[in-house]
Amino acid sequence: MLAKTWLEHARGVMERIEATQLEAVGRAAEIMADSIAAERWVHTFGCGHATIPVEEMYPRIGGFVGFHPMIELPLTYFTHITGEMGIHQFLFLERAEGFGREVMKSYEFDPRDTMWIFSHSGLNPVNIDVALEAKARGLPLVVTGSAAAYRDEPARHSSGMKLFELADVVVDTCVPAVDASVPLADHVDNVGPVSTIAFTAAVWMVITTVAERLVERGVRLFIHPSHNLPGDTTARERLDAALREYKRRVAGV
C-alpha cells in the first residue's frame, strides 16, 4: 500500500531533521527572539507551495505576534490553474529577476528585524532578490529549505548566488531534490511530495524554541488561543488582545 510508503518517507525526513538540525533551529530561534523582544518583526516570505509554511505560522491558533507574513498573491494564488493568475504566470514570476526587489519596496524594514525565507531549491530569482535586499538593509537572514540536496546545482540569479549561500542560518528540511517521493509503475514522475510536511515541522520547531527563549527573557507573548473550546469564556478576549497588539506593531511596516 503506497500510503505506508509515503509515511515511511515522511518519517524519514522528520528523523533526519531531528538528528541534524537542532543546532540550526536554536541559532535561528535566538536571532528571531532578539527581533521579537525588541518589538520588531520576523518577516516571512516564500512562493508557490513554500508560502504554506508562511501561512501556517501566523495568524494561527498557537502562533503569536512577531511574525509578519509577506504574501504576494501572484506567487501564492495559482489554483485557477489556467486563465487569470494561472500556473504559467506564477512560474514566470518566481523566475523573473527583479520582481522580488519590487516586492521589498512596499515595506519598511529595520535592522532589528529578521527575514525568514522558505524555498525547496533555493534557486528561484524572486527569493534571491528578497534575500539580497534584506541583507542590504542589515537584516539577518534565516532560510529553510533543502540545502544539502541542491548544494551542487548552478545558480540562476545574475548575482551568481543561491539562497542558501546568503543565509546567516540555514535550517535544512532534509528533503531530496526530487520532492515527490513515491514512484508509480509505468510513470516517469513520482507522487507524494514531502517538502510541505518538512517545512511545517521546521516552522514549529523554530517557533516553539523562539517562544521558549522569549519566556526565559520575561517577554509576554500575544498568543492566538484555541477559540472553540467549550467552557473557555475568555478566548475571544485573548484573541482580540493579540490582534490589537499586531495592529499596533505593524503600523510602521
Tell me what each language-model feature is.
Residues 1-20:
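Generic N-terminal amphipathic, Lys/Arg-enriched alpha-helix
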Residues 2, 24, 194, 198:
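Conserved acidic
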Residues 20-28, 42, 214-224:
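Flexible, glycine/charged-enriched surface loops at secondary-structure junctions
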Residues 20-37, 103:
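A short, well-structured juxtamembrane/interface segment
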Residues 37, 44-207:
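Glycine-rich phosphate-binding loops that contact phosphosugars or nucleotide phosphates
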Residues 179-183, 212-237:
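Internal, active-site/partner-interface "lid" segment
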Residues 229-253:
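Acidic, Ser/Thr-rich low-complexity intrinsically disordered segments
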